[in-house]
Amino acid sequence: MARFLFTCWSFPGHVFQPMAIAHVLRERGHQCAFYSGPRAARTVEGENFPFFPSDKAEEDAMYDFMFAPEQTRTVNWRTMLQFSSTIQRWLLGSIPQQVRDLERIAAGWHPDVVVTEQNMWAPMLVLHEKQHIPVAVLGYISCFVPGPDAPLFGLGLPAPRNWYTRLLTRSVWLGTAPFRAGYRRSANEIRRRYNLPPLRTSVLEFTGTMPLYLVMGTSEFDYERKDLPRSVKYVGACLWDKLRHERPSDWLEELPKDQPWVHASEGTVHVVSPFVLSAAARGLANLPMQVILTTGGNREPSELDLGPIAPNVHVVRWVSHTELLPRLAVMITTGGSATVQTTLRAGVPLIVIPTDWDKPDIARRVVETGAGVSLTPAQCTPQRLRAAVEHVLSTPSFRQNAQRMAAAFARYGGPPAAADLLERLAAGRIPA
């Protein structure tokens, strides 16, 4: 049996999806362990997996600059330089500590394969060559390896399907070349410390040279790309069902069944004002629908100033998506990958208000599949959100396209398919 070391950041969504794969591997007799920030310890150890924590001071510093309210978390032409600096500090500045940690773990635990999320670069840039350990990459919902079939990730740009969008993609690619060159220079400086040769491609292109790149999503949601290396495999949604750890949402049974149900969530981690929940509470008040608002794991409903709460609006900290989604008419979300995949897998249309990081790109994909609409945070007023909800409810094509995406997700194997490929990698049968 093989040993698989999963390395990921300690954000909840980054832990939960690898966890689904680890459970399948363990059921097949393999050993799995996790390397992440101390904030992930409770989740990982609660599932009885060995846990190797990264440095707490480094994690605290990363959370401070990643989630500070004034931090730049979205990219446009005005914020490009600051956003690039933030990403460089996060992805490249953390590599030396990761290497020290992972070398120590490798010496004691002896993993056969390191399975790393696409945003943790030390295993790909250093460990794979220095320790001669096979590395598999985990992509959340889409593939970051650049190519002509997809826009540059981070800007929420449309897919290059016609002359205009192809020209736009090419122009952005050329305009951002200095930033990519800066990343590569910094990566090569790090590689030089470990006596590794310099990269000849961008860092993201280099990630596609790993022996296996698993995308926890579908090709249909990722523009059906034909430009990816053979190592890239779409395995479908890898979602960890935590229902057995939580109390059932019995109160849902008391809600009227003859009205559409609308759910609004700002995700597990939300550091700005609850503007989506506030717009939903005000804009959907007293309409012929049931509105379920969840505040997330780090906020109590009583802490939020959402204004007067109408009888048809229900504010809770958490609700089981397993129980809620089969009854849902519309999902309102800030665009986290797990929420979007869970919703599409259930065939429910979305309204996405993308807030930061990869969410504008996820929102763009939702719109291009026809499974929902997108509003910018500035557009998320009570009036516009109400109009968006009424538009989605009254337009059958949104649900039809969401159901089409659900059928696409059903064609993929999910965690068992990912486990199959990882077993092949551990056995030396990848690349074929």
Where are these regions (language model features)?
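A donor-sugar binding/catalytic signature common to diverse glycosyltransferases
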Residues: 22, 116, 317-364
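Conserved nucleotide-sugar phosphate-binding/catalytic loop shared by glycosyltransferases and other
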Residues: 33-83, 163-168
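Conserved nucleotide-sugar donor-binding subdomain of glycosyltransferases
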Residues: 68-123, 166, 170-204, 208-209
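Conserved nucleotide-sugar donor-interacting segment of glycosyltransferase catalytic cores
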Residues: 91-166, 220-221
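C-terminal amphipathic helix plus adjacent low-complexity
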Residues: 109, 382-432
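Active-site-proximal region of nucleotide-activated glycan assembly enzymes
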Residues: 135-223, 229-231
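Donor-nucleotide binding loops and adjacent catalytic segments primarily
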Residues: 217-330
